[in-house]
Amino acid sequence: MELLCCEGTRHAPRAGPDPRLLGDQRVLQSLLRLEERYVPRASYFQCVQREIKPHMRKMLAYWMLEVCEEQRCEEEVFPLAMNYLDRYLSCVPTRKAQLQLLGAVCMLLASKLRETTPLTIEKLCIYTDHAVSPRQLRDWEVLVLGKLKWDLAAVIAHDFLAFILHRLSLPRDRQALVKKHAQTFLALCATDYTFAMYPPSMIATGSIGAAVQGLGACSMSGDELTELLAGITGTEVDCLRACQEQIEAALRESLREASQTSSSPAPKAPRGSSSQGPSQTSTPTDVTAIHL
C-alpha cells in the first residue's frame, strides 16, 4: 500500500468568523479599553533615542515587511512586530548597529504568538546576511521580553477589522476585497512612525474608510461613512477624518516612491550574492500593487 501526502499549503486551516463573537459589543469594548495600554506615550526619537532617527526606523520596517511577505507570515505578524519595536525603543536607548538585531527579534516573538509555524532563528540570521548570530538572537529575545514585561498579547489594528466590517454590512462579494485593501493600508501605516502613537482602532477605522471609498464598495457618501465608522469605535469624527486623509496621503507618497524606484536602473547585486537566496526587493509588493 502506498500513502500519498497532499499537504501542499503552508498555512494551517483557520476557523471561520463567529457571528456571535463579532456581534457582541462587549468584545469590541474590551479591545477598546485595552488598546491604549500598548501605544507608545511619547516620541522616543525626542525623549529616549540619540542615534536612531525616523528614516532608520522606516528602512528597518520595510526590511521586516519584506521578510514577512516572503515567508508568507500571517498579516498580523508584521504590525505586531512593529508594536514590539516601538514599545522597546520608547524605553531603552539603542545603538543604530543593534537596530536590525532588534527588528529580527521582534519578528521572532510576533511569529511565535501569531503563527502556527513561527519563523526560525536560523532563517532570520540568513535574512540579516549573517550580521546577527543565533546566540545574539536568543540573548536579545530574553532582553526584549524583559523590557516588555512579557506582555506580548498587544491589541493591534488588525484585531478590529473583523468587528468593524461585521457592523458595516457590506455586500458579501466586496467584503474580502475591502479587507485586503485595509490590511495593505495597515501594513503601510506600520512602516510610518507618524501612526505609531495613534490608537489601533482609529488606524483600523481609517483604513477601512479609505478602502471602502476608494473601491466604491457602498452607496453612502464620504461623510455618512465616516460618521458610521466613528460611531462603531467611538472615535471623534474629525480625528477619524484626519487619520483617513493621512493614510491616503501616505499611500500616494508610497506609490510615488515606488514609481521612482521602478524607473531607476536596477542596482548591481553584491559580490558573492546568489539568486537562490532571499530576494532583496526594495518596495513592499502589496503597497505598489494596490489600485484605488
UniProtKB/Swiss-Prot annotation:
<keyword id="KW-0132">Cell division</keyword>
<dbReference type="GO" id="GO:0016538">
    <property type="term" value="F:cyclin-dependent protein serine/threonine kinase regulator activity"/>
</dbReference>
<comment type="subunit">
    <text>Interacts with the CDK4 and CDK6 protein kinases to form a serine/threonine kinase holoenzyme complex. The cyclin subunit imparts substrate specificity to the complex. Interacts with ATF5. Interacts with EIF3K. Component of the ternary complex cyclin D/CDK4/CDKN1B required for nuclear translocation and modulation of CDK4-mediated kinase activity. Can form similar complexes with either CDKN1A or CDKN2A.</text>
</comment>
<dbReference type="GO" id="GO:0005654">
    <property type="term" value="C:nucleoplasm"/>
</dbReference>
<dbReference type="InterPro" id="IPR004367">
    <property type="entry name" value="Cyclin_C-dom"/>
</dbReference>
<feature type="region of interest" description="Disordered">
    <location>
        <begin position="254"/>
        <end position="292"/>
    </location>
</feature>
<dbReference type="InterPro" id="IPR013763">
    <property type="entry name" value="Cyclin-like_dom"/>
</dbReference>
<dbReference type="Pfam" id="PF00134">
    <property type="entry name" value="Cyclin_N"/>
</dbReference>
<keyword id="KW-0131">Cell cycle</keyword>
<dbReference type="GO" id="GO:0097130">
    <property type="term" value="C:cyclin D3-CDK4 complex"/>
</dbReference>
<comment type="similarity">
    <text>Belongs to the cyclin family. Cyclin D subfamily.</text>
</comment>
<protein>
    <recommendedName>
        <fullName>G1/S-specific cyclin-D3</fullName>
    </recommendedName>
</protein>
<keyword id="KW-0805">Transcription regulation</keyword>
<dbReference type="GO" id="GO:0061575">
    <property type="term" value="F:cyclin-dependent protein serine/threonine kinase activator activity"/>
</dbReference>
<dbReference type="GO" id="GO:0005737">
    <property type="term" value="C:cytoplasm"/>
</dbReference>
<comment type="function">
    <text>Regulatory component of the cyclin D3-CDK4 (DC) complex that phosphorylates and inhibits members of the retinoblastoma (RB) protein family including RB1 and regulates the cell-cycle during G(1)/S transition. Phosphorylation of RB1 allows dissociation of the transcription factor E2F from the RB/E2F complex and the subsequent transcription of E2F target genes which are responsible for the progression through the G(1) phase. Hypophosphorylates RB1 in early G(1) phase. Cyclin D-CDK4 complexes are major integrators of various mitogenenic and antimitogenic signals.</text>
</comment>
<dbReference type="GO" id="GO:0097133">
    <property type="term" value="C:cyclin D3-CDK6 complex"/>
</dbReference>
<dbReference type="GO" id="GO:0005634">
    <property type="term" value="C:nucleus"/>
</dbReference>
<keyword id="KW-0963">Cytoplasm</keyword>
<keyword id="KW-0804">Transcription</keyword>
<dbReference type="GO" id="GO:0005829">
    <property type="term" value="C:cytosol"/>
</dbReference>
<dbReference type="GO" id="GO:0004693">
    <property type="term" value="F:cyclin-dependent protein serine/threonine kinase activity"/>
</dbReference>
<dbReference type="GO" id="GO:0019901">
    <property type="term" value="F:protein kinase binding"/>
</dbReference>
<dbReference type="Pfam" id="PF02984">
    <property type="entry name" value="Cyclin_C"/>
</dbReference>
<dbReference type="GO" id="GO:0000307">
    <property type="term" value="C:cyclin-dependent protein kinase holoenzyme complex"/>
</dbReference>
<dbReference type="InterPro" id="IPR036915">
    <property type="entry name" value="Cyclin-like_sf"/>
</dbReference>
<feature type="domain" description="Cyclin N-terminal">
    <location>
        <begin position="27"/>
        <end position="152"/>
    </location>
</feature>
<dbReference type="InterPro" id="IPR039361">
    <property type="entry name" value="Cyclin"/>
</dbReference>
<feature type="compositionally biased region" description="Low complexity">
    <location>
        <begin position="272"/>
        <end position="285"/>
    </location>
</feature>
<keyword id="KW-0597">Phosphoprotein</keyword>
<dbReference type="GO" id="GO:0005815">
    <property type="term" value="C:microtubule organizing center"/>
</dbReference>
<dbReference type="GO" id="GO:0042098">
    <property type="term" value="P:T cell proliferation"/>
</dbReference>
<dbReference type="InterPro" id="IPR006671">
    <property type="entry name" value="Cyclin_N"/>
</dbReference>
<feature type="modified residue" description="Phosphoserine">
    <location>
        <position position="279"/>
    </location>
</feature>
<dbReference type="InterPro" id="IPR048258">
    <property type="entry name" value="Cyclins_cyclin-box"/>
</dbReference>
<feature type="modified residue" description="Phosphoserine">
    <location>
        <position position="264"/>
    </location>
</feature>
<feature type="modified residue" description="Phosphothreonine">
    <location>
        <position position="283"/>
    </location>
</feature>
<dbReference type="GO" id="GO:0043539">
    <property type="term" value="F:protein serine/threonine kinase activator activity"/>
</dbReference>
<dbReference type="GO" id="GO:1900087">
    <property type="term" value="P:positive regulation of G1/S transition of mitotic cell cycle"/>
</dbReference>
<keyword id="KW-0539">Nucleus</keyword>
<dbReference type="GO" id="GO:0000082">
    <property type="term" value="P:G1/S transition of mitotic cell cycle"/>
</dbReference>
<dbReference type="GO" id="GO:0007165">
    <property type="term" value="P:signal transduction"/>
</dbReference>
